[in-house]
Structure formats: structure tokens, C-alpha cells
Swiss-Prot record:
This is Coiled-coil domain-containing protein 200. Residues 70-82 have a biased composition (Low complexity). Transmembrane segments: none annotated. Residues 16-50 form a coiled coil. Keywords: Coiled coil. Residues 23-168 are annotated as: Disordered. Residues 83-94, 104-117 have a biased composition (Pro residues). Residues 124-138, 145-168 have a biased composition (Polar residues). Residues 31-52 have a biased composition (Basic and acidic residues).
Length: 168
């Protein structure tokens, strides 16, 4: 009888050791995966940071380089006109600089088409929504949005908590 007890205790101990060993391996694998993920995320962030400054620097650099080259090569009288055209497009949204800078044919041409199209688009939207509202109000099943069950014949019985409990 003593030997059976001994073997049973040894079997249990071996099972415990095996479980501990497996748990330790799983923890090590998880830690390695977490470290790999962290490293991968850091690499991605670093690569994004490397790409973003280049993009940010590359976009402003060509206009700056063009301005410097245009300022270095031409005379000072040409520098002022080259600086003025970039300053002219931002004032265009305001009405006063448009009248002063441009004779008037170019800015009014883009503005009149949006004005007629905007009221027509608004009218279309209001007509469309009124049609949708009429269609919604004419639907027989949606009398009150707060109703628990619309008046429709769907073929399914209304699910209630008592029905659900009774099914089990």
C-alpha cells in the first residue's frame, strides 16, 4: 500500500511540475510577444516620425526655394511682384481686395453660379425631406416611434421576457 501512495504522490508532483513549466513557458512567450509588439510599434512610430518631418519640410521647402531663387536671380523690382501674387489669393475671399486687385470679371464669375445653385439645392433638399416626411407619415407600421411593436404582420410573435423564460 505504501508504494501505491508513493507513486500517486510522485504522479501528482510531476503533473504540478509540468503545469508550472508550461505556465512559465507561456509567460515567457507572452513577454516576448509583448516586447516584439512594443518594438514593432516603436519602429512604426519612428518611421512615421521620420516620414512626417520630411513631408513637412519638403512641402514648404520648394516654395521657399523658388522664392529665394526668384529673389536672387531677378532684380529687386521683380521681387515685389513675385511676393505680391502669393499675397493676392488669400485676400480674394474678402470682397474689398477683390475689387481693388482684380478688375472684377474673374471673381464675380465664380460667385454667381454658386448663388443660384445654392437656393435650388436648398429647395431640392427641402422638397426631398418633405417627400421623405410624407412617406414616413404615410407608412402604416410606424405610427409612433416609441411604440414597442409596430402594427405589421411579420410572422414572428413578439418576444417578451416571459416567452423567453418559458422557452428554456
Amino acid at each position: 500500500m505504501g508504494s501505491a501512495y508513493h507513486w500517486e504522490a510522485r504522479r501528482r508532483q510531476m503533473a504540478l511540475d509540468r503545469r508550472r513549466w508550461l505556465m512559465a513557458q507561456q509567460q515567457q512567450e507572452l513577454q516576448q510577444k509583448e516586447q516584439e509588439l512594443k518594438n514593432h510599434q516603436e519602429e512604426e512610430q519612428q518611421s512615421e516620425e521620420k516620414l512626417q518631418p520630411h513631408k513637412k519640410l519638403n512641402v514648404p521647402q520648394p516654395p521657399v526655394a523658388k522664392l529665394w531663387t526668384s529673389q536672387e536671380q531677378p532684380q529687386p523690382s521683380q521681387q515685389q511682384p513675385s511676393v505680391q501674387p502669393p499675397s493676392q489669393p488669400p485676400p480674394q475671399p474678402s470682397t474689398l481686395p477683390q475689387a481693388q486687385v482684380w478688375p472684377g470679371p474673374q471673381p464675380p464669375q465664380p460667385q454667381p453660379p454658386p448663388q443660384p445653385t445654392q437656393p435650388s439645392a436648398q429647395a431640392r433638399c427641402t422638397q426631398h425631406t418633405s417627400k421623405c416626411n410624407l412617406q414616413d407619415s404615410q407608412r402604416p407600421g410606424l405610427m409612433n416611434p416609441c411604440q414597442s411593436s409596430p402594427i405589421r404582420n411579420t410572422g414572428y410573435s413578439q418576444l417578451k421576457s416571459t416567452n423567453y423564460i418559458q422557452q428554456w
